[in-house]
Regions:
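Multi-pass alpha-helical transmembrane bundle typical of ion/small-solute transporters
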Residues: 1-278
Length: 278
């Protein structure tokens, strides 16, 4: 819900949409991502961080408990935290403790670690150059005309950012659920018959894809309004042109990493983009 609010906080800040309309707009495009993106991020979460064959329900439980405790502690002490990264770390910890480093997929972990740093930097750099290019193109236009134009364009930029957010964040959850189902499908008849076909290899069932995208859209509707209003008010000085450039830059970063199968933080990405636009 917090990341959903981040995805369209700028259109509330610039008064393009009310908080209610903003969360409905975000929810629609969160779900629409199901028709555009594959499940590369889900596969990374399921088999690109730890060896899927080593996973069992106890390790998943430990991963979830560990990440929840860490997020709660950081929130309690006012420390900025990415839930996505906490979940990834929570998965690595118990697997490493139980099986050692041989059960870890080093290439996947390195890729994620690199993009923890790169995703906000890419967002910031794209934001800076997008803002510079926009200012160059519209330097001779009247400020009021430019503001009106970019209020309209923010509908597009917020939509594609919500697409990127949906593609990345929904797949993180489906990857964790899929690996849990994969781990028990061999020994649980109900799971293998009705929930997860035991093919011997990791995959993401269609029903799970639809469910995760539906849940992220519903979560945006149910809990996003309060958070997005707070974020929007906090960004009250942001102009429509800045909002457009930040969202477009953040969207390009999120969609690019989703295609590459790299789970990144929506919060960190949009923060970097906002810094980049100044």
């Amino acid at each position: 819900m917090n990341d959903a609010a981040n995805s369209i906080a700028t259109i509330v800040a610039t008064r393009v949409f009310s908080p209610t309309m903003a969360v409905l707009w975000a929810a629609f495009w969160n779900f629409a991502a199901i028709f555009i993106f594959g499940v590369s991020v889900a596969h990374t979460m399921g088999e690109g961080i730890v060896e899927a064959s080593r996973i069992n329900e106890y390790l998943i439980f430990a991963a979830l408990i560990g990440s929840v405790i860490w997020v709660w502690l950081c929130t309690h002490f006012g420390m900025p935290i990415s839930v996505s990264h906490a979940l990834i770390g929570g998965l690595i910890g118990p697997v490493w403790f139980t099986f050692g480093s041989d059960a870890l997929v080093a290439s996947g972990i390195i890729k994620i670690a690199v993009f923890i740093v790169l995703s906000p930097l890419i967002g910031m750099i794209l934001g800076f150059f997008t803002m510079c290019l926009t200012m160059l193109i519209f330097r001779r236009k009247h400020p009021l005309k430019v503001e009106g134009l970019f209020k309209g364009l923010q509908l597009f930029s917020s939509a594609i950012f919500s697409l990127g957010h949906g593609a990345n964040d929904a797949q993180k959850t489906m990857g964790i659920i899929a690996i849990l189902l994969y781990s028990v499908a061999g020994s649980n008849t109900f799971v293998s018959e009705y929930l997860y076909e035991n093919t011997g290899s990791f995959h993401v069932p269609v029903w799970l894809i639809v469910t995760c995208y539906s849940v992220i859209a519903l979560g945006t509707i149910v809990g996003g309004k309060k958070v997005i209003k707070t974020l929007g008010d906090g960004l009250a000085r942001l102009k429509p042109v800045q909002g457009f450039c930040a969202e477009t830059s953040g969207a390009l970063t999120l969609m690019g990493t989703a295609v590459l199968g790299i789970p990144v933080s929506t919060t960190h990405t949009i923060t970097g983009a906002i810094i980049g636009v100044g």
